[in-house]
């Protein structure tokens, strides 16, 4: 029975028994900061179990995609070395939300295994929590399980909890017995860690609420949460003991072997690659991109581990992305979203492999040398840190290589080096925060700014220097808290409103509006005239021109977000934003620079929607209803049961609490002014709207006019004239390079005659004026060819800066490394450098000491050669 057939039979079995089949949720948990990835079938139902969410069904079944890599649940280091560890797996599960309980859950499980899958009862072993007499009775008396294949477990292994407090309850586990030919004993015995008995299904009975003091109170509506690994079940049904021998993995392993040009399918590296393509492809499908933090860094670690195992198999060209096709063939029918995302997944994996390939070979050489020169079975933390910091090796990749050599990594030393780097970064940042402005007031403020920009209200608190006062005098800076306010407090990337607060005797200029907590709105500014009193009646007036400009930019940001997803793909999600009266800035997830053509299309889409002039509407509704509408939510934001949904026609739907235009046409015009990268996997677009956009277009027009005048060309011939100029420039550059090469050839012959012989190695250290770094490299390459066995350092000085290039012929790199050679000179002239063993570069800023440093090279080489 294939894995696909097993999945289908499981879901049909429970659908026939009144369960709603629910699609797998994303690997990125929605609004759950406690989890890095979805790691169990119950994750998408967590709020249902906790009573925070209600679904239109009380029975559910699912085949849930799961990842266990990074965080508390981390199987990464074991993948490839064991029969059953994976970074990605599918969990089959059936769930009851206050409907059926132990009896039905147990009977369903037994029926599915013994009647649908026809597993022999004598091959199954049951465990229950020792105190769960009800489950014990059902198994032994109603189901009729053999008491000789039944164990009571007294430990927490058979008692599940969601956390230190909350729902919890006993478990009942079902094991498959591979038979006496396999080592290992039944669960609950000292030999239980063997491979004979494999857990295939866990039935969790949520029947208690655990309080902070540990006491257990029965739940009014007990529930059921079960989980069964598809891969383990497939291994049982296909009569293999290793998950990597099931149909799904066999085909992926074969595909990886073809790329590696090997017929030995038992190599653990092939299994690693077959496992990792599943987790990586589905993570990218669900919007995760490689980066240096959080989920993105876990993805990067998995990708790089797979690439390293490809390198170990002898693969030197990008290969990992080529496995997305075979994966789609295996899993695309069950998960069509993978097939839909295939081009994007292949592109992301290919880009990441190209990026890592640049440093993989160098890093592996350094690691090989470190292992070869070890005097102990431990790779130093400093070496692991150098590989991480310089060559992009995640430390678990280094540990993986160490494990293959029977070695360990000094993790404590690695962490010390990491902490030292963090300290250097903190020391260099010089940021300071004034925490004295944290304000504690037992008051609330009602926001009325959606309806109007002016509000008659009352002052409920005044603060000066963070302290509550009854009065502010003219010229004093302070904070005003109002009973009601039309001022929007900075939130969701939109800056706070500015304006004035007027009383009969005072004018307070609001420079910024901030929120503290959920309902305290702080108006920060300066009292321009009069005296402001706590309790006074006043009028709050928002500066409407600034608000309108900000609102237009905010609505344009929503249009931009929607356009990005249409042009670049559904993986685009907001990573940050800034919306103020002058401009908008939008950070989003994407794996490469946005091309000029894509930027044009994005801008065209936004301006099309502006011309369509759709109404901008806001509606408060239940969060579930908003999600069903397809509203975009910001990951990491916490939303209540009711949310504000902002829609711009049928083009954009997002959860947003900000101030917006009334119609899309109010924006007028949208113009992108820049696109850049701000972090790995995060891009930034800055844009302007309205009058600022018109000014940007006019500025471009003025620039084009000036260029045309200087080129003595019309608008229609300007591009042609520029092409002619560039071609002429390229011809001149080629002629210059030819002359330089001719000069370098003559200089090379002269320099070669100045080399000295030290123990059979030609050594040359010379200054070559009027040469740039490129010419120095070409000269070094020429001299290596001319001199045979050689060690060379050439230097040039320009503008008080020294450039150095060192070269060593390959037959001598075992004795002399170019990086060490160039640094022997660079350190004496206030610089440093590095490079490959045969070629390295450096710089310095003390040209007056250069000649002395060059004169010392022959003696330095003599020491290296022990001559």
Swiss-Prot record:
Keywords assigned by UniProt, alphabetized: Aminoacyl-tRNA synthetase, ATP-binding, Cytoplasm, Ligase, Metal-binding, Nucleotide-binding, Protein biosynthesis, RNA-binding, tRNA-binding, Zinc
Chief location bin: cytoplasm
Keyword Cytoplasm: yes
Pfam families from the UniProt entry: DHHA1 (PF02272), tRNA-synt_2c (PF01411), tRNA_SAD (PF07973)
GO cellular component term, pick one: cytosol
Compartment list: Cytoplasm
MF-aspect GO terms: alanine-tRNA ligase activity; aminoacyl-tRNA deacylase activity; ATP binding; tRNA binding; zinc ion binding
One GO process term, biological-process aspect: negative regulation of DNA-templated transcription
Enzyme class: ligase
Highest taxon of source: Bacteria
Role description: Catalyzes the attachment of alanine to tRNA(Ala) in a two-step reaction: alanine is first activated by ATP to form Ala-AMP and then transferred to the acceptor end of tRNA(Ala). Also edits incorrectly charged Ser-tRNA(Ala) and Gly-tRNA(Ala) via its editing domain.
Domain notes: Consists of three domains; the N-terminal catalytic domain, the editing domain and the C-terminal C-Ala domain. The editing domain removes incorrectly charged amino acids, while the C-Ala domain, along with tRNA(Ala), serves as a bridge to cooperatively bring together the editing and aminoacylation centers thus stimulating deacylation of misacylated tRNAs.
Name of this chain's protein: Alanine--tRNA ligase
Organism name: Methylococcus capsulatus (strain ATCC 33009 / NCIMB 11132 / Bath)
Gene name, Swiss-Prot/TrEMBL: alaS
């Amino acid at each position: 029975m294939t894995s696909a057939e097993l999945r289908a039979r499981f879901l049909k079995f429970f659908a026939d028994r009144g369960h709603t089949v629910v699609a797998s949720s994303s690997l990125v948990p929605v609004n759950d900061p406690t989890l890095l990835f979805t790691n169990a079938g119950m994750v998408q139902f967590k709020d249902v179990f906790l009573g925070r969410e209600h679904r239109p069904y009380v029975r559910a079944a699912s085949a849930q995609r799961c990842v266990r890599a990074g965080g508390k649940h981390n199987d990464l280091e074991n993948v490839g070395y064991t029969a059953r560890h994976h970074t990605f797996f599918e969990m089959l599960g059936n769930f009851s939300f206050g409907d059926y309980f132990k009896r039905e859950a147990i009977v369903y499980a037994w029926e599915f295994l013994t009647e649908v899958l026809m597993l022999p009862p004598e091959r199954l072993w049951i465990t229950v929590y020792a105190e769960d007499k009800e489950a014990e009775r059902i198994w032994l008396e109603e189901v009729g399980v053999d008491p000789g294949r039944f164990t009571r477990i007294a430990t927490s292994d058979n008692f599940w909890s969601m956390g230190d407090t909350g729902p919890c309850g006993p478990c009942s586990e079902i094991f498959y017995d591979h038979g006496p030919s396999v080592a290992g004993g039944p669960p609950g015995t000292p030999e239980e860690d063997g491979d004979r008995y494999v857990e295939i299904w866990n039935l969790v009975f949520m029947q208690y609420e655990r309080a902070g003091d540990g006491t257990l109170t029965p739940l009014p509506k007990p529930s059921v949460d079960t989980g069964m690994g598809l891969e383990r079940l497939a291994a049982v049904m296909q009569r293999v003991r290793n998950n990597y021998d099931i149909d799904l993995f066999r085909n992926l392993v074969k595909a990886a072997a073809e790329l590696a040009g090997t017929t030995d399918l038992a190599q653990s590296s092939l299994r690693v690659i077959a496992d990792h393509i599943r987790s990586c492809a589905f993570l990218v499908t669900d919007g995760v991109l490689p980066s240096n933090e959080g989920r993105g860094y876990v993805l990067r670690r998995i990708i790089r581990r797979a690439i390293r195992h490809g390198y170990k198999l002898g693969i030197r060209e990008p290969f990992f992305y080529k496995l997305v096709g075979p994966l789609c063939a295996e899993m695309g029918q069950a998960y069509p979203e993978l097939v839909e995302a295939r081009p994007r997944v292949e592109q992301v994996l290919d880009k990441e492999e190209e990026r890592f390939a640049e440093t993989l070979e160098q890093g592996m050489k350094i690691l090989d040398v470190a292992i070869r020169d070890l005097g102990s079975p431990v790779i130093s933390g400093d070496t692991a840190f150098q590989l991480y910091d310089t060559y992009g090796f995640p430390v678990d990749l280094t540990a993986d290589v160490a494990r293959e050599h029977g070695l360990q990594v000094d993790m404590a030393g690695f962490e010390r080096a990491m902490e030292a780097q963090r300290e250097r970064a903190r020391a260099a940042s010089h940021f300071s925060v004034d925490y004295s402005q944290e304000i504690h007031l037992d008051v609330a403020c009602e926001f009325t700014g959606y309806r109007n920009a002016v509000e008659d209200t009352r002052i409920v608190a005044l603060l000066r220097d963070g302290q509550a006062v009854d009065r502010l005098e003219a010229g004093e800076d302070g904070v005003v808290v109002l009973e009601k306010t039309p001022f929007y407090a900075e939130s969701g990337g939109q800056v706070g409103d500015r304006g004035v607060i007027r009383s009969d005797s005072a004018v307070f200029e609001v420079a910024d509006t901030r929120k503290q907590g959920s309902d305290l709105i702080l108006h920060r500014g300066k009292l321009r005239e009069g005296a402001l009193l706590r309790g006074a009646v006043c009028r709050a007036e928002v500066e409407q021109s600034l608000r309108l400009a900000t609102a237009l930019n905010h609505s344009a940001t929503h249009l931009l977000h929607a356009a990005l997803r249409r042009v670049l793909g559904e993986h685009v999600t907001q990573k940050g934003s800034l919306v103020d009266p002058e401009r908008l800035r939008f950070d989003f997830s994407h794996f490469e620079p946005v091309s000029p053509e894509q930027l044009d299309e994005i801008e065209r889409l936004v301006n099309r929607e502006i011309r369509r002039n759709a109404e901008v509407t806001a509606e408060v509704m239940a969060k579930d209803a908003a999600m069903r509408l397809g509203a975009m939510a910001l990951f990491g934001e916490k939303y209540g049961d009711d949310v504000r949904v902002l829609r711009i026609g049928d083009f954009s739907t997002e959860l947003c609490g900000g101030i917006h235009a009334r119609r899309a046409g109010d924006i007028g015009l949208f113009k992108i002014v820049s696109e850049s990268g701000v972090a790995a996997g995060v891009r930034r677009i800055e844009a302007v709207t309205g009058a600022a956009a018109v000014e940007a277009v006019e500025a471009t027009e003025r620039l084009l006019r000036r260029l045309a005048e200087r080129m003595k060309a019309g608008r229609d011939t300007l591009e042609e004239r520029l092409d002619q100029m560039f071609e002429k420039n390229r011809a001149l550059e080629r002629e210059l390079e030819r002359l330089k090469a001719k000069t370098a050839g003559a200089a090379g012959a002269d320099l070669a005659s100045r080399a000295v012989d030290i123990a059979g190695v030609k050594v040359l250290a010379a200054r070559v004026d009027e040469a740039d770094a490129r010419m120095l490299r070409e000269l070094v390459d020429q001299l290596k060819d001319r001199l045979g066995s050689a060690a060379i350092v050439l230097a040039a000085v320009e503008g008080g800066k020294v450039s150095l290039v060192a070269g060593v012929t390959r037959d001598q790199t075992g004795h002399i490394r170019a990086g060490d050679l160039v640094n022997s000179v660079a350190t004496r002239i206030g610089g440093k450098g590095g490079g490959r063993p045969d070629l390295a570069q450096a710089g310095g800023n003390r040209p007056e000491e250069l000649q002395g440093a060059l004169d010392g090279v022959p003696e330095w080489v003599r020491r290296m050669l022990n001559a």
